Amino acid sequence: MIKITIVTCTFNAEHELQRTLDSVFKQSYADIEHLIIDGLSTDRSIEIAQAYKQHSDEAETGHEILVCSERDKGLYDAMNKGILKATGDYIVFLNAGDTFPLETTLEHIAHSIGDGEALPGVIYGDTNVVNDDGHLLHRRRLQPPEKLTWR
């Protein structure tokens, strides 16, 4: 089974974070590592993240959850911390306020990847931009890059 790491970067996002955590909690796919990387928030973000971890553990979702709160140098530093802590085969960035469109999103992704020896190096998809009520504002379609480099 393919392990998917979700990295959620957050900083003082108490009003946005819960919907992101709920979206991950509801995923039907079990082999999930969820890293919540917080930039030392001064609001209730840490409390919300820790309550989510406890709720997920009690519900026996199978999701591994790590909450890390320490000062960082902004979003990209937090993302890099998440990459370094990740143990999954693939990393998904789902920041505070972001959600998956379906409860089966990760299940569909894992199924489309398969368990073959030749796994794709990058997976990407379109982005739906929605308002606070969840109504679609527009869709951002991505083009595959012509060249990728890894450093």
What residues fall within each predicted segment?
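Nucleotide-sugar donor-binding/catalytic module of glycosyltransferases
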Residues: 1-151
